[in-house]
UniProtKB/Swiss-Prot annotation:
Primary subcellular site in the record, as a coarse category: cytoplasm
EC number: 4.98.1.1
Phenotype of gene-disrupted mutants: Cells are sensitive to visible light (which is lethal).
GO cellular component terms, A-Z: cytoplasm
Short name of any one Pfam family annotated for the protein: Ferrochelatase
Localization, UniProt: Cytoplasm
Family named by the database record: Belongs to the ferrochelatase family.
The protein, known as: Ferrochelatase
Binding site for Fe cation: 194, 275
Length: 320
């Protein structure tokens, strides 16, 4: 019997190719055109997207990207490549490809890369610890579209999420402990997750429950009292209600109430990116300190730390 050759596809959101208005516009157009992300009627959405949002947002967002851009590219791309390379070293018998839902490298190029390695089984690991239709669902949709055009389809194992995975929770807990040891234990640990429209949750997306699961498990692993850990949601877009409480409004409220020292972690981000390094580490720091807070530290994403790579290796090992 022929032995199965398994490959790994690491999937993430994506990034512009450069911190320029043109590159950001291309990226945002693809991202905001996905019905998994924005499901508004196309008749209403296309004119708004092309005539208002892209022309106005692209130059402003490009400046934000420029403020965090690294020598090797955007932070998300740099850390994602490091994850890919480290996991390939950890599992040398399994080819590892990186694909993004939007931008380059595409999910299609990642699938083709693995098929060129003659794999007959692909383990797909979307690097979103908490499932959402707008992230993991988008990976599923694109993967199905890609494979629908193939004459031969490999076996697929699709990891839905890992919100309560033991290795993931331990890696987060150790990262928090290291931050506490460096900066002192704060008055409050704030866990900020990317938001989604409240309507998506009302219609069945269990993302908020998965975020609560991670929050509960992490607080338990740290032995912290529930009142010392708070869960919020960031990066809202548009006018309709998103999951609450909002991170920025919560930080303002806490500063005004006299909370002096806060540390913020974003457990839903497997790699640091614009939303963590600029929005959380910079913008929201200013919000908290401006409202009266005294100390504010951002705890980095797990990125390509050894514990994170070991977690990924253990996660996919069951499917090899």
């Amino acid at each position: 019997m022929r032995q199965t050759k398994t490959g790994i596809l690491l999937a993430n959101l994506g990034t512009p190719d450069a911190p320029t208005p043109e590159a950001v516009k291309r990226y945002l157009k693809q991202f905001l055109s996905d019905r998994r992300v924005v499901d508004t009627s196309r008749l209403l959405w296309w004119p708004l997207l092309r005539g208002v949002i892209l022309p106005l947002r692209s130059p402003r967002v490009a400046k934000l990207y420029a403020s965090v851009w690294m020598e090797g590219g955007s932070p998300l791309m740099v850390y994602s490549r490091q994850q890919q390379q480290a996991l390939a070293q950890r599992l040398p018998e399994m080819p590892v490809a990186l694909g993004m839902s939007y931008g380059s490298p595409s999910l299609e190029s990642a699938v083709d890369e693995l098929l060129a390695e003659h794999v007959d089984h692909i383990v797909v690991l979307p690097l979103y610890p908490q499932f959402s239709c707008s992230t993991v669902g988008a990976v599923w949709d694109e993967l199905a579209r890609i494979l629908a055009r193939k004459r031969s389809i490999p076996g697929i194992s699709f990891i839905r999420d890992y919100a309560d995975n033991h290795d993931y929770i331990n890696a987060l807990a150790n990262s928090v402990r290291a931050s506490f040891a460096k900066h002192g234990e704060p008055d409050l640990l704030l866990l900020s997750y990317h938001g989604i429209p409240q309507r998506y949750a009302d219609e069945g997306d269990d993302y908020p429950q998965r975020c609560r699961t991670t929050t509960r498990e992490l607080a338990s692993a740290l032995g912290m009292a529930p009142e010392k850990v708070m869960m919020t949601f960031q990066s809202r877009f548009g006018r309709e209600p998103w999951l609450m409480p909002y991170t920025d409004e919560t930080l303002k409220m806490l500063g005004e109430k006299g909370v002096g020292h806060i540390q913020v972690m974003c457990p839903g981000f497997a790699a640091d990116c614009l939303e963590t390094l600029e929005e959380i580490a910079e913008q929201n720091r200013e919000v908290f300190l401006g409202a009266g807070g005294k100390k504010y530290e951002y705890i980095p994403a797990l990125n390509a730390t050894p514990e994170h790579i070991e977690m990924m290796a253990n996660l996919v090992a069951a499917y090899r």
